[in-house]
Amino acid sequence: MSTPQLVLPAPAKLNLMLHILGRRPDGYHELQTLFQFLDYGDELGFSVREDGEIHLQTDVPGVPHDSNLIVKAARALQQQSGCTLGMDIWLEKRLPMGGGIGGGSSDAATTLLALNHLWQLGWDEDRLAQLGLTLGADVPVFVRGHAAFAEGVGEILTPVDPEEPWYLVLVPQVSVSTAEIFSDPLLTRDTPPIKVRPVPKGNSRNDCKAVVERRYPEVRNALNLLGKFTEAKLTGTGSCVFGAFPNKAEADKVSALLTETLTGFVAKGSNISMLHRKLQIL
């Protein structure tokens, strides 16, 4: 591998709560959710090509090259901007697929921001976020890089600043299909809307949790194990579960006990994504 011109992180996110308010006529769901980033994620490398080709140099098992959101993001930006340059892209994958922590969406957002920089397009955040929304509902929050209360299908973002604890995230070895969860007839779809401020705490939950637990015993097991030490929550539509701790030492202590049988990691919550902190010093 040649040395990339630019290396950037693609951070994970957590849904600290996820309420489903109803189903729209177009089949999508109205929801309210609270996004916060983690100082942990994938890493991407980028080098400009002169021939206009987009090449992801890293194979992702189970995902064809042209179906990868990284490639889709690069080609969408290339097409919309009219840029004739190309890009070689490398991926160091740490975030699980179907984990509910934003792996694919975060990779796509990092790609948009990196290519905007390297191709010197000068697109602003609003324009990049609008393009990101065509790739996935979670892409805009990663483009903007600030913890947010999201409404609509997840695209209406209000910046917020919740507490930034340490988290233990457990990763059950299953990939959860978002479409499968949202189409489940037993999914709660009538939660009353809540206000953005104060930042939701006690009255918050994940409306997908009961459906995911019923369909995936591995997730139920992880929630039960973590729940012995702290409040255990599901992020997104799963499969990852998480719990908050006041400091790294306590999170590490529980991690040492649980990761003998489960995969997991400890990371700091952050209201400004590590991607944006890196971009600010370029």
From Swiss-Prot:
Pathway: Isoprenoid biosynthesis; isopentenyl diphosphate biosynthesis via DXP pathway; isopentenyl diphosphate from 1-deoxy-D-xylulose 5-phosphate: step 3/6. It is an enzyme of class 2 (transferase). Keywords: ATP-binding, Isoprene biosynthesis, Kinase, Nucleotide-binding, Transferase. The keyword DNA repair does not apply. Signal peptide: none annotated. Its EC number is 2.7.1.148. The keyword Nucleotide-binding applies. GO terms for molecular function: 4-(cytidine 5'-diphospho)-2-C-methyl-D-erythritol kinase activity; ATP binding. It comes from the Bacteria. Pfam families: GHMP_kinases_C, GHMP_kinases_N. InterPro entries: GHMP_kinase_C_dom, GHMP_kinase_C_sf, GHMP_kinase_N_dom, IspE, Ribosomal_Su5_D2-typ_SF, Ribsml_uS5_D2-typ_fold_subgr. The active site is at residues 13, 138. ATP binds at residues 96-106. One of its GO terms (biological process) is isopentenyl diphosphate biosynthetic process, methylerythritol 4-phosphate pathway. It catalyses: 4-CDP-2-C-methyl-D-erythritol + ATP = 4-CDP-2-C-methyl-D-erythritol 2-phosphate + ADP + H(+). Belongs to the GHMP kinase family. IspE subfamily. Catalyzes the phosphorylation of the position 2 hydroxy group of 4-diphosphocytidyl-2C-methyl-D-erythritol. PANTHER family: 4-DIPHOSPHOCYTIDYL-2-C-METHYL-D-ERYTHRITOL KINASE, CHLOROPLASTIC (PTHR43527:SF2). This is 4-diphosphocytidyl-2-C-methyl-D-erythritol kinase. The gene is ispE.
